[in-house]
Amino acid sequence: MRAFLCLVFAAILAASPAAAQQTENERLVAYFDYVVFGNEFAGRALPTVRKWTEPIRYKFASNNAAITKYRPVVQAHFASLAQFTNLSFQEIGPRDPGENFIIGFAPLAGLVAYGRTLAANPAEVAGRQFETASCFFLSYIQDGRLVAARVLAGSDLPDQELVHCLLEELAQSLGLPNDDDRVAPSIFNDSLHLTSLSLIDKVLLRLVYDPRMRPGTPRAQALQLARAILAELNPGGG
């Protein structure tokens, strides 16, 4: 893990000369804050850590050409996310009970309408952020724990964009909900369209899913804890 973080710190410095004025640990804590607590639509910070504590049992909402094509992509994305969260992901059949995660595809023109059919409350899929989205996620929380999620993606997107979109939304539905172009290189930076996790993304996932980062942890406490975890892994922060 220590060698892994050394690579991350080198990547941060290469990404932005401004990082020279800020220790690597401080910069990663800032990235953690942007992605975990930022809220691009509400304009205010989310108050607590949200994360999964139970295995994820996912299914595809319907059987169509997009699912046939992109099932291996989703499986690969989940395998990558599992490495850095210690979550388990199991696909179940479309008629099997017990799912807590649903993935659906529809043409962009009908994506919002389709999303409403999968939402716990159709009215929650409303507003400009959905009307202009090429993919989006919905998540449901109990006591800081994520207990259900939906990911919707436009089936007529260009291939590379859809691969990126799936990875970003799947990761965001795990408790890292915000996009922020200050985080680079990262899947959470919409200007880059990465199709695999960057080193920075892997650290952010590890921080959220460190056992000490409990669901419902208030933001201020979580930032202190993230700083302490990074200090253990990179003493001195430089």
Language-model features: locations:
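Positively charged n-region of N-terminal signal peptides that target proteins for export
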Residues: M1-A3
